[in-house]
Amino acid sequence: MSYTGFVQGSETTLQSTYSDTSAQPTCDYGYGTWNSGTNRGYEGYGYGYGYGQDNTTNYGYGMATSHSWEMPSSDTNANTSASGSASADSVLSRINQRLDMVPHLETDMMQGGVYGSGGERYDSYESCDSRAVLSERDLYRSGYDYSELDPEMEMAYEGQYDAYRDQFRMRGNDTFGPRAQGWARDARSGRPMASGYGRMWEDPMGARGQCMSGASRLPSLFSQNIIPEYGMFQGMRGGGAFPGGSRFGFGFGNGMKQMRRTWKTWTTADFRTKKKKRKQGGSPDEPDSKATRTDCSDNSDSDNDEGTEGEATEGLEGTEAVEKGSRVDGEDEEGKEDGREEGKEDPEKGALTTQDENGQTKRKLQAGKKSQDKQKKRQRDRMVERIQFVCSLCKYRTFYEDEMASHLDSKFHKEHFKYVGTKLPKQTADFLQEYVTNKTKKTEELRKTVEDLDGLIQQIYRDQDLTQEIAMEHFVKKVEAAHCAACDLFIPMQFGIIQKHLKTMDHNRNRRLMMEQSKKSSLMVARSILNNKLISKKLERYLKGENPFTDSPEEEKEQEEAEGGALDEGAQGEAAGISEGAEGVPAQPPVPPEPAPGAVSPPPPPPPEEEEEGAVPLLGGALQRQIRGIPGLDVEDDEEGGGGAP
């Protein structure tokens, strides 16, 4: 039996025309009864696989719409003498039977697929024998399992891949991963790639397109199985590089299962090591050697098993080295980052220390400013004390001479001195009167030394005005008002309102009580003045009949400072209400030595002075109660003391 082999470059071809298609035998191979005369399996389906990059020359079979085997005019010279032989008929029948099986299997596999026209012809291919690989398989068993096919696979071989050519070309290396090893070997061997399935393997695969498992020869039409290996369909399932909603991936059968497992085990570290390796080494073989690490497919050639094993071992060693290098690089990078972070912390600490230093300096400056302000305030207070007229017993202060003169002649001042005269010896009360008059004269002399007295007085008033530091948007201004100390009430500076307040019953009752408390407080101030060492010495001299107010200028300055301090303490304590009471109570014990100088000249006066001293604690307690807001509780005792005085 002779047959014609369809090998590129051969001179023998076979041409036969069946005019009577009904005479063609039918056969059942477990898939149903197929007749080549029908259109089943051929209509709308073009199947071709070869190795030419272009389809200009077509070698092999091409199915025409007339259901006849015809060779194209561009084929090699036909041998018409062999068309009438019986052996040719049997050969063609077997060929038709086997070709009927292929489209049926493909149509079952590609459910809902869109196929090309039936008029397309088969492209040329190189002879390849796959019997060595498929010897253990059944006669008509395909190279993949039907159970793993998805019914939703819908794809067109002609036009649906065109839109993804560029995308697939860019992602071809990473998408197919290790399964693309066979394609790379074919590309290095200089063998032309296949252009079957329309343009399926032409542009999308490029140099990565893969041949069938038998890389040396294609299967013969008379072999046990003419169906191509599942390696032919790599890249058609899963991966996400193709449209249509179906899951295209890395082959079928056991290979697809293995690739599913390996795909799940892939991590981003594998791709990172690839990139680092390429950047460092730059050799084109490293991605292929790394790809063999996860290659678990069965479609490797038997002739190249040793070579692939060598490549796999080299790939494993290379990948391990790459991983180690990447780990070392990662550790180095982490160390560098840590060093940078540590380096950043030091300047931060330095910045913090500088901030602390700045804060400390600011605090020191603020403290210095506060101390300076306090010093200025003290100096101002001293200046005010020197130029201001003061009546310590009545707690009256003023910057003007006429006001001070009017105060000394006022009823208020005289009543206070009368009350003090009833509680103290007459000579002591007279000494206090002379002391206040002499102090007023000294203040007048000090005021004459000041050049701009009026400006100084105005400056003092400005300093006392706290509203100057408040901005105008707060709408706060200084106003003049009358303060009623008896009623503890501020009254607007209006004549009618002030007169109305003065005529009220509450004000009259409060002012009488306040007058008694003011007299008692004046007695306490008098005792505090007499307890001063300098003033007590003057009092002794005054009692002896000498003039105590004719001292040297140096002594006068010392006395003024001492007297000013004592009087100011008493006056400020009385004004505050608390400090005065505290000073008045402890000031009482030193008072008893006062009768000693009085007892020397007139013996009778000491006993009355001692009796008067017994009433002093009551005055102090009444003052404390008045300060605490309970005025008038000691009125009866005060009236008794006051009644005895007049």
From Swiss-Prot:
A motif (Nuclear localization signal) lies at residues 274-279, 362-364. The modification Phosphoserine is found at residues 283, 297, 552. One of its GO terms (biological process) is RNA splicing. The modification Phosphothreonine is found at residues 267, 292. Residues 264-381, 545-646 are annotated as: Disordered. Residues 587-607 have a biased composition (Pro residues). Residues 298-314, 552-563, 634-646 have a biased composition (Acidic residues). It is found in: Nucleus; Nucleus matrix; Nucleus speckle; Nucleus, PML body. InterPro entries: AKAP95, ZF_C2H2_AKAP95. The modification N6-acetyllysine is found at residue 257. A motif (Nuclear export signal (NES)) lies at residues 280-296. A zinc finger (C2H2 AKAP95-type) spans 391-413, 484-507. Residues 1-268 are annotated as: Sufficient for activation of CTE-mediated expression. Pfam families: AKAP95 (PF04988). Residues 564-586 have a biased composition (Low complexity). The modification Omega-N-methylarginine is found at residues 208, 217, 237, 247. Keywords: Acetylation, Cytoplasm, Host-virus interaction, Metal-binding, Methylation, mRNA processing, mRNA splicing, Nucleus, Phosphoprotein, Repeat, Transcription, Transcription regulation, Zinc, Zinc-finger. GO terms for cellular component: chromatin; cytoplasm; nuclear matrix; nuclear speck; nucleoplasm; nucleus; PML body; ribonucleoprotein complex. Ubiquitously expressed. Expressed in the brain cortex (at protein level). Interacts (via N-terminus) with DHX9 (via RGG region). Interacts with TMPO isoform Beta, PRPF40A, RNF43, lamin-B. Interacts with HDAC3; increased during mitosis. Interacts with EBV EBNA-LP. Interacts with HIV-1 reverse transcriptase/ribonuclease H. Belongs to the AKAP95 family. This is A-kinase anchor protein 8-like. It comes from Homo sapiens. The lineage of its organism: Eukaryota, Metazoa, Chordata, Craniata, Vertebrata.
